Amino acid sequence: MKDNPISLFHELESYVRGSKDTLHRYMYACILEQRLADLLLLSRCGVHPDDEDRLAVRLASQRSLCVQAASDLAEGTEEARGSTPAWPDCKVTKSSAAQKRPELLSLVKVMQELRTPECSGYDLCDLEVCREDALHWLRDHADPSSPPVLIGVRTGGAFYAPLWSSALQQRWGNKALYHTVRALRMPSDPGASLYLPEELSILPAAIEPDTDIVILEDQPHTGGTVLELAGRLSAKYRLNKPVWVSSPGRLFQIENGRLAKCSDRIPLNTGTRKRIWQMLGNSEEVAEFLLPKLGLTDAHPADLEAVPYKSVPQWNDPMYRREVPFRINPKKTPFYIRRKSTNEPVVFAKFIGKDLFGDFQFHQLKKFEKYFPDILAYQDGYVMTKYEPGLKEMREMFVNMPSAVTREICQSVSGYWKTLLDSCQISGGHPVHPLADHWQARLGEMEDFIGRKLPYDLDWFERSLHTEWTSSAHVYTSLPYANQYGHWKARLSAGQRLKTYRFHIDSTWGGTSSIEVELASFLLENRVRPDDFRLLVNQVKKEAGSLTIEAVTDALPIACVLQAANLLKQAKDESRLSKELILSEAMQSFEYLQAMKPKLSDVR
């Protein structure tokens, strides 16, 4: 998994180097701690060549840096101190990990991704409250004579544990250390958590009988992740007292194999001004706050209102903390700013994450400005763009427009993948696409849902889904969540000037994908003709030397299964797509693929 010099992670390192923001530096330090801890785990499992002792020393040093950065953050230090450590490369591929230790596949996948923790994406908190959580635990729930063993569960817990350690060092100095462990997924049961003995053995060999253990984790859902870890720790240390669990603002104890809530408070800093996502539901407040930032010189506050793109569920309001599970989740709450007098939308606002993750995402997004409406502002994790009325779906244009127009579309959108390769490339991608294991089950579920058999070539799909993409360029992208044709639009002006748009470029909730699958998804969703297929692939090939038309053709069935999986998801979530719409879309896609298959031999 050797990192490309232009990889996403080196882009992140460069961005943080240019920032003096203490929160940016703190979160990057925690991301780096996770990277080093994962590398040490791979080394101890015999699949990474780096020296264990050297990695262990560097990891201990990095954790000290995390605690210092946590103290700076909690104390309100205005400007970050010290240098930004370099991003450590990794020389492990998924195929080599699979051959030696199949259970490490999920770890290598995690290491390819810039995962947004819940605290920055969809269970928002102000991180500094975690330090107050630790002091609250000391004051109201425990009076230990020795420092507790602090264990953060990577990913989320790695951002909380240093803040606890920083608080506890006020009493115990450098003895208040912390550790992190990675919860992996069992190959035989993806819903179950797995902690490897090679990592648990790094924890203290023994502890005093009255020592407390505190596990730091994102908000527990079922509690399965922390309950499994607590069980392993109880066996390791022969515990005679309950294990504590903390997520931002919350404290639990494990009693009789269950999580019992001890305290709960809204995890927001009361000294911080109100953010947009705290104003949701109050249209006038949102509009009045944003107007000075949007450059709408002809608008008056009384004539503007904020209108949810979707309904704003009450559980997004901090006052509804009693709801379970509770989240402050702006991911679900895009909105328009609209003129009351004309009902005309003028601004569209979408949340892309807060703190370092949102800020870096916005930094990346600006590289794609050519494919965006005009960006008016970025505030509190929301990107606000000029509302663009009258856009046409690109699919409609590929189907109905003359070849001169569709060729121009292909020329225009090819630059999107160039920018993606330049800014979001990762290394060591998937030898076989993740959908390969269960693709027939997914299509079977779709057939059951629509009550029809899908027309597809079983051999072609089986060969495609098990293609090894080891020589491909891989990117971190929004594709797994935003591959529908509705994300691609265009406008042809009266003077025949073409402007193309790609919506939902942000990969805050994204994943890894090969460039072949990226292109195949675009071609399938937009019903691209064979000649345009060839033109687009050859344009992108200029930036991705290993790309071939044959490989993109081989990826088309993957795009079809990916679309089916997303349609099924939308049938179940809040959007609740109708059965009739899903039937129409699925059948058209599979029929398009069947009709295209004999023509693709000419494209090759």
Swiss-Prot record:
Co-factor binding details: Divalent metal ion.
Keywords (A to Z) from UniProt: Antibiotic biosynthesis, Glycosyltransferase, Transferase
pH behavior: Optimum pH is 7.5.
Keyword Cytoplasm included in the entry's annotation: no
Thermal profile of function: Optimum temperature is 27-32 degrees Celsius.
Cofactor: a divalent metal cation
Pathways per UniProt: Antibiotic biosynthesis; butirosin biosynthesis
Molecular function in Gene Ontology: pentosyltransferase activity
This protein's name: Neamine phosphoribosyltransferase
Organism name: Niallia circulans (Bacillus circulans)
Gene encoding the protein: btrL
